[in-house]
Amino acid sequence: MADLLIELFSEEIPARMQAKAEADLLAALTGKLKEAGLAWKTAFAVSGPRRLTAVVEGLDARSADVREEKKGPKVGAPEQAIAGFLRGAGLTDISEASVVSDPKKGDFYVAYSTVPGRDAKDVIAEAVPAIIRDFHWPKSMRWGTGELRWVRPLQRIVCVLDGAVVPFEVGGITSGNETEGHRVHGRGPYTVTGWADYKSQLEGQGHVVLSRDDRRAAILGGIEKACAKAGLQWIEDKGLLEEVTGLAEWPVVVLGQMDPDFLDLPPEVITLSMRTHQKYFAATHAKTGKLAPNFILVANIAATDGGAKIAEGNARVLSARLSDARFFWEKDKATPLEVMGEKLKTIAFKEELGSLGDKVERVAALARELAPAVGADPGLAERAARLAKADLVSEMVGEFPELQGVMGRYYALAVGEDARVADAIRDHYKPQGPSDSVPTDPVSIAVALADKLDTLVGFWAIDEKPTGSKDPFALRRAALGVVRINLENGVRLKLSNAILKAPLAVRPVVKGGQSDSVRSAASKAIDALIDPTLLSFFADRLKQVLRDQGKRHDLIDAVFALGEDDLVLIVKRVEALAAFLATEDGATLLAGYRRAANILKAEEKKGALPDGLSVDPALIAKGPAAEQALWASLNETTAALEAPLKTEDFAGAMTALAGLRAPVDAFFEDVLVNDSDAKVRENRLALLIAVRGALHKVADFSRIEG
């Protein structure tokens, strides 16, 4: 057994690429070893700003010999067949082959050969250069006059097997056993013999924390210690934490202080400026929760003054950044949102759907239409929609696109707009992902729904729907947003009605003398709206939401098939249906339904089911008791369903359906549907149709699986 250490040492690797490169290196190396027939006990990899390291412990020193056999022709086969076999097997005479007997096939020739194993050293010397040459980076470069590509110039390659260098050369770099430590604290070089020695020297004299997990833990510990001492609470940012973990080999947390005067800027501006430009964490006062005039940086050096000069220098840089932000803030506040909004007319949204200004007009009209249904003031909803996109042309959003909507809210509040209007400007983009919250104020709900529905209807009108994994206009996210907004707020809105209001908002675009393509899209809007694929698209998103909650997708189909598109109502029906089917009555009635449905399906397939069949009570009265009992129960159930369905008492509706269970069972037990009397047969089929129809008042049971 042998131990292998490989290090690929380069200039700085972008932080975002390190984790994947670490995994890719390990996968490529173990893949090559496995392919060569070598086994090992453990294998792992680590990565950092300047190195990718892979370790394999307990590696076979040599792969096993492999015995191969090549089957040949039968004994006594023609000379031509035997000659071909000898050439293929590398034999000079047939006497070198073995004869194997098979009870069915008879005697035939077999050539055996042994492929000798290979030393691990030889396999590695061949595999590692190939891995380096074929390694995939999202972005790579060449340097000097060489042809080798790497993410940044590759400087050293360590390849040590059981303390000895595995010699090879790739891209002009010869493998060796020397590496470097921290640029300032322990550059080295260091001669290493294996993983234990490598780790000991680098994490000791070399001042390099090799593991990402260890660096992350060191950073978290440093942040918590610094904040506890200063009475602060850091604003957690997992994305930034991962990034700075990949920026420092020897992470040292430094707490800095900025000019408190900058706190008059919106906190989102300050924290985003820190994060985007400087990779700093922000902090709040632990007692008040308000943003503190502090920043937390992760240095790659342990300064002798405790980081005071580092903090001072970074404070100056941050001050310059925030001064720029203050300039944008003051300039934007001097421009009314209505004036900003005028510029949207010159910005294309989609050629066939006009400008962003056109979209704003449509959304404003649609928000007014939807407002009563969600309990919002129509005037406020329209006002918010007209201002919602204005900040897209602001200086601040130009610098920080992530602040779209957020800055619009601040600018609206600064001039005295209604707080509900301001909040809707910020929240109409929500939810922007599965973990994002949905708007909850009625005005925000109206504008958010209008914005998303306008986008969906527009792209359906121009036939640009998502296909496969491609969704360049984030239509799935928009539809999912509509679903979540409705469900999480209990909004009672029929999607078909809401969608059909969209053309009312599209028509003003046509009146505005827009291009032929815009008029064409508007004229197609009605057809697009009644396209069943749009409602099906929403159904798929609803399934996604409910599936994440552990609910069955087939029950959603069963309810949606009735033409129901009030999402809140669908969920209530699905929950009641799931509870009913979990009972013995529900499961048995479903089995009875399927039996009836199969009989009817077979008759329909044969064309033996006349149109307009209806039950003749007189014939029922002459039939068996079980038939009469089912007819009576069906009438009772149909009557009993009316009240609970009208009041949306779906549990009550299921209770009413349960009354059919025993009569349906008895009917199939005692009654022959396919009676010799044609009229009796048709009447019994009509009875089954009536049973099916009663169940379909609650859900399409044919869509239920299992």
From Swiss-Prot:
Cell location: Cytoplasm
Catalytic activity, as annotated: tRNA(Gly) + glycine + ATP = glycyl-tRNA(Gly) + AMP + diphosphate
Gene Ontology biological-process entries: arginyl-tRNA aminoacylation; glycyl-tRNA aminoacylation
InterPro entries reported in the protein's UniProt record: DALR_anticod-bd, Gly-tRNA-synth_bsu, Gly-tRNA-synth_heterodimer
One Gene Ontology MF term: arginine-tRNA ligase activity
Cited SUPFAM superfamilies: HD-domain/PDEase-like (SSF109604)
Key words of the record: Aminoacyl-tRNA synthetase, ATP-binding, Cytoplasm, Ligase, Nucleotide-binding, Protein biosynthesis
GO cellular component: cytosol
ATP-binding listed as a keyword: yes
EC assignment: 6.1.1.14
Subunit structure: Tetramer of two alpha and two beta subunits.
NCBIfam families, sorted: glyS
Annotated family: Belongs to the class-II aminoacyl-tRNA synthetase family.
Stated name of the protein: Glycine--tRNA ligase beta subunit
Organism (species): Hyphomonas neptunium (strain ATCC 15444)
